[in-house]
């Protein structure tokens, strides 16, 4: 979990790739 909301299920790939 690196971003805030995330794309898939709130994993590492979110707003801040």
From Swiss-Prot:
It is found in: Secreted. GO terms for molecular function: neuropeptide hormone activity. InterPro entries: Pyrokinin_CS. GO terms for cellular component: extracellular region. Its main location: secreted. The modification Leucine amide is found at residue 17. Keywords: Amidation, Neuropeptide, Secreted. The keyword Secreted applies. This is Pyrokinin-5. It comes from Symploce pallens.
């Amino acid at each position: 979990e690196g971003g805030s909301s995330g794309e898939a299920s709130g994993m590492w790939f979110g707003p801040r790739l």
